[in-house]
């Protein structure tokens, strides 16, 4: 009797669920996996970035030497592992999605060569990062650095819009600028922050004082990434939201 009741309900229930729930297939499955991976890795990366800047830096200033010797070797290697690999996954997956599904679609619609677009964009990203890297190696004043970084971001956005703006749509341009800032942040993580933090952790374990300029460079690079994350996240939002900041939505 009971089994018969379940059988009577199963058919209409299946029809209802079929109307309400639709599993991704084919190309849609690849897209959603890439986007989901990008979101999860980005949350890990940026979440730890904000933890470092808003919580860890003020806390470390209050700890004495013996306490740092206990806390830093336990906390920092693990946090930095998730931090740096979260950055790698975020950027690589984001680049894959951008090239395959956003820039390629836009380029096809306007009759442009997607590889030429991608190559020009990456070249601009790397040239501007080289300038940022030199600035981070030479500028020790946080306020001056903030001004320079702001000007660099504006100049970078202007060049990207000049190269892609005539035919680029809002998604291509928003992620072109925002994703470029994300690549800068990734390069800062591996090229400056992680390299410096390895030496700082080793010195702390050995009971020696790490060079002050090393800690300062790591701090300023991390703070720069925190600044860059704000326009980066804003532009990620405008690329898929209701606000069209650049180009067209064709």
Predicted regions and their residues:
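Polytopic transmembrane helical bundles with strong interfacial aromatic enrichment
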Residues: 2-250
């Amino acid at each position: 009797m009971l089994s018969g009741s379940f059988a009577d309900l199963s058919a209409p229930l299946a029809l209802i669920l079929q109307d309400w729930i639709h599993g991704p297939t084919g190309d849609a499955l690849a897209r959603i996996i890439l986007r989901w991976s990008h979101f999860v890795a980005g949350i890990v990366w940026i979440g730890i970035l904000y933890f470092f800047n808003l919580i860890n830096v003020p806390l470390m200033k209050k700890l004495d030497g013996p306490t740092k010797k206990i806390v830093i070797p336990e906390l920092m290697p693990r946090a930095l592992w998730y931090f740096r690999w979260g950055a790698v996954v975020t950027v690589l997956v984001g680049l894959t999605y951008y090239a395959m599904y956003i820039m390629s679609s836009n380029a096809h619609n306007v009759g442009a060569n997607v590889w030429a677009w991608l190559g020009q964009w990456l070249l601009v990203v790397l040239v501007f990062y080289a300038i940022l890297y030199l600035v981070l190696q030479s500028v020790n004043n946080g306020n001056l650095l903030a001004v320079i970084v702001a000007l660099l971001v504006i100049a970078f956005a202007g060049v990207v819009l000049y190269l892609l703006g005539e035919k680029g749509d809002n998604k291509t341009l928003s992620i072109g600028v925002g994703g470029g800032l994300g690549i800068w942040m990734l390069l800062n993580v591996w090229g400056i922050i992680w390299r410096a933090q390895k030496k700082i952790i080793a010195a702390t374990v050995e009971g020696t004082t790490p060079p002050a300029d090393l800690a300062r460079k790591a701090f300023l690079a991390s703070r720069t990434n925190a600044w860059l994350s704000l326009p980066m996240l804003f532009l990620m939002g405008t690329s898929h939201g209701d606000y069209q900041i650049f180009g067209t939505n064709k």
